Amino acid sequence: MKAILHKANTRGHANHGWLNAYHSFSFASWYNPERVQFGVLRVLNDDTVAAGMGFGTHPHDNMEIITIPLEGDLAHKDSMGNESIIKTGDVQVMSAGTGIQHSEFNPNADLQTKLFQIWLFPKYRNVVPRYQQITLDIAKQKNNFAQILSPNEEDEGVWIYQDAWFHLADFDKDFSKTYEIKKAGNGIYVFVISGTITVNGQELETRDGFGIWDFNKLE
């Protein structure tokens, strides 16, 4: 087994007033040559957006972009004609492909929005852009690895143009579970939203990241 530990306090940080962002991988003005990507995982941003504020219209291409709200809502609008509110408990994905433009705003006047935005390099370049949003069954995450994303349109969760799988889990104290890799040769990146867990002997705390490869299962 090979592994790399990203402690929460080693992440990049930028506070723009309206946006307080922590970067697990190099992003914008924060660059760490040892923290550019983990496999196809390019961006893992932990964002807090102030009430009534947000990201103006901006472009993307050839990237799989996943948004997971943790608290509050996010209003989305894009050049494909999609307009939606992404709520806590939802997951949204955009395959940017040949190119899209979109904006994201906190629609609430008095509540902040917290979210993860995750970017993955695509398996195929210049695909037709697509959008998908679903509401998750939170109960499935209790003491279980609930799949929320995969490469398969027919599978549970949203799907993307990449051989990657996302799972969310909410474990009770002293609960133990084994995770088996989905595809030979893939690695796994574990990110702790809240609490303390032990993964293959490594203790992880809130907002720590842990990348593992050359292994068969996770305990």
Predicted region positions:
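A short glycine-rich, His/Asp/Glu-containing loop-to-beta-strand
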Residues: 15-59, 63-64, 115, 137-180
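Short beta-strand segments
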Residues: 44-45, 69, 95, 119-121, ...
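Histidine-centered metal-chelating micro-motifs
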Residues: 54-56, 73-76, 92-93, 97-105, ...
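Glycine- and acidic-residue-biased ligand/ion/polar-headgroup-sensing regions
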Residues: 61-80, 88-91, 174, 179-202, ...
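Generic beta-strand structural signal
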Residues: 64, 84, 90, 100-102, ...
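Short acidic-glycine-tyrosine-enriched beta hairpin
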Residues: 80-95, 138-141, 200-219
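Ligand-binding loop in jelly-roll beta-barrel domains
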Residues: 81, 96-126, 205, 214-219
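A short secondary-structure junction signal
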Residues: 103-105, 126-134, 157-161, 179-181
